């Protein structure tokens, strides 16, 4: 299964045009994510594909907690421009910041992502 969460998490300082969620709002919505799903989010999880140009992590704690708890096979995110096309792992979960360029992933018949 696939599960998605849109919007910037945590709330960003970009003004009224930005659709954002608080960490608490994201936690509630992520409760419905099935175990071992493919998780598609706008924001990355904290400490995975989330560093800005200055090296500051901008990712979401709520998304990271959901990854640790639900163990998705794959997490596809974007949002943090300086980390586009980066890959990382949280446990057995592959995290990919696809950015606007996209990324090519290989999924084996047994569900392994590389």
Regions found by a protein language model. Give the residues of each.
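Conserved catalytic scaffold of divalent metal-dependent phosphoesterases
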Residues: 1-58, 62
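Generic alpha-helix signal with a bias toward terminal, lower-confidence helices
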Residues: 14-17, 53, 79, 92, ...
């Amino acid at each position: 299964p696939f599960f998605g969460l849109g919007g910037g998490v945590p709330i960003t300082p970009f003004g009224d045009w930005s659709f954002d969620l608080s960490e608490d709002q994201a936690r509630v919505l992520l409760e419905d994510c099935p175990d071992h799903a493919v998780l598609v989010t706008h924001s990355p999880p904290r400490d995975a594909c989330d560093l800005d140009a200055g090296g500051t992590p901008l990712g979401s704690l709520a998304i990271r907690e959901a990854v640790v708890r639900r163990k998705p096979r794959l997490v596809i995110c974007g949002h943090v421009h300086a980390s586009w096309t980066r890959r990382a792992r949280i446990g057995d979960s592959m995290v990919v910041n696809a950015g606007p360029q996209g990324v090519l992933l290989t999924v084996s018949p047994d569900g392994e992502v590389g």
